Each structure stands twice: as C-alpha cells, then as structure tokens.
C-alpha cells in the first residue's frame, strides 16, 4: 500500500485518490459543503488555509493545507519509487 503525506503528519492511501484540486472554484466549494453535510469531510488543515482538496474513491473529501502541486509531486515520487522497487524485485 502506498501512502502519501498530506501535511502535519496526516497520511492518505495513494490507491484511494481520485483527484487533487484547488479549493477556489465554486463547484469545489459546493462539493466541500455537501461532504460536510453528509459527514464525509476530513479536515486535515490544523486550522490553516485550505490549499488542496483531495477527492477519494469512497466519496470522502479531504482538506489539506499543502499545495495540490506538492501533493501530486509526492504521489509521483512514490509511484516512481514503487516502480523501481518492482523492477528490482523482478530482476533478483
């Protein structure tokens, strides 16, 4: 299982991520409010400004204080590390 640090020691399963988006647009604000109403919102900002909204395959919405680009970079780094590990295990 691949895990991604989304800030302040909070970690999310990379396999469950559907999208990482900015919270600025009206549709995303609406998604956040709907998730809050349904009890499916996870606020991992520790009171700081929300900079990334993470949408999971279970319809949970996670708020993060880390930039979407940073989360995506961490995800890509994990995937590259995983690919190298997979290749190494095949050749051994």
UniProtKB/Swiss-Prot annotation:
Any one Pfam family match given in the protein's UniProt record, by short name: RemA-like
Feature: compositional bias, Acidic residues: 82-92
InterPro entries (alphabetical): RemA-like
Spans annotated as Disordered: 73-92
NCBIfam families registered for this protein in UniProt: MtxBflmRegRemA, PRK04323.1
PANTHER family: REGULATORY PROTEIN SSL2874-RELATED, REGULATORY PROTEIN TM_1690-RELATED
Family: Belongs to the RemA family.
Protein name as it appears in the record: Putative regulatory protein Ccel_1792
Lineage per the UniProt record: Bacteria, Bacillati, Bacillota, Clostridia, Eubacteriales
